[in-house]
């Protein structure tokens, strides 16, 4: 089985919160697809809570689209990592990391402004597969931690695992 790109970087050296351009690929028609690692927690040191991560999944995708989408960039998907240390963001286009950082910061500010559980999008039995697995308070704690820590930019060359 081929080794996935996410397993070719040294997780013991990853800072968090931080952005990493994980890969850029071309579609058959020549469009760029970029995949970003949005690392909220230092791997193997901390994880996001299950309910907080799920609530962030509902909020973060919309807020990031508001702050990052443009004529040159369109977010395809933002999904939580199984290890609960971050999210992967796939998009059409090639925004620079500073633009992604700014959009992430603004999105975390937006999370803090959400007033109640009722304001979480798609939080119902028809649109969510685990609609009781949410916590706005935990999502706000994650957002505040990101903002307090500041978001950095990872360097792929420094994270590359040798001998792969």
Curated annotation (Swiss-Prot):
Q: Which reactions does this protein catalyse?
A: S-(5-deoxy-D-ribos-5-yl)-L-homocysteine = (S)-4,5-dihydroxypentane-2,3-dione + L-homocysteine
User: For binding Fe cation, which residues are annotated in this chain's numbering?
Assistant: 54, 58, 128
- GO MF annotation, one: S-ribosylhomocysteine lyase activity
State the Gene3D superfamilies in the record.
S-ribosylhomocysteinase (LuxS)
- Per its database record, what is this protein's job? Involved in the synthesis of autoinducer 2 (AI-2) which is secreted by bacteria and is used to communicate both the cell density and the metabolic potential of the environment. The regulation of gene expression in response to changes in cell density is called quorum sensing. Catalyzes the transformation of S-ribosylhomocysteine (RHC) to homocysteine (HC) and 4,5-dihydroxy-2,3-pentadione (DPD).
Q: How does it assemble?
A: Homodimer.
Q: What is this protein called?
A: S-ribosylhomocysteine lyase
Record organism: Campylobacter jejuni subsp. doylei (strain ATCC BAA-1458 / RM4099 / 269.97)
């Amino acid at each position: 089985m081929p080794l996935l790109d996410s397993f070719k970087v040294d997780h013991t050296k990853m800072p968090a919160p931080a952005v990493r351009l994980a890969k850029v690929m071309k579609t058959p028609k020549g469009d760029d697809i970029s995949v970003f690692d949005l690392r909220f927690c230092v791997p193997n040191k901390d994880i996001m809570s299950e309910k907080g991560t799920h609530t962030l999944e509902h909020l973060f995708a919309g807020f990031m689209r508001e702050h990052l989408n443009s004529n040159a960039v369109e977010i395809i998907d933002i999904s939580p990592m199984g290890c609960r240390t971050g999210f992967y963001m796939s998009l059409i286009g090639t925004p620079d990391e500073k633009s992604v950082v700014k959009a992430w910061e603004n999105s975390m500010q937006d999370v803090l402004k959400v007033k109640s559980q009722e304001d979480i999008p798609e939080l119902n039995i028809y649109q969510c597969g685990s609609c009781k697995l949410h916590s706005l308070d935990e999502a706000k704690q994650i957002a505040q931690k990101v903002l307090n820590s500041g978001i950095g930019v990872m360097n792929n060359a420094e994270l590359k695992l040798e001998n792969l």
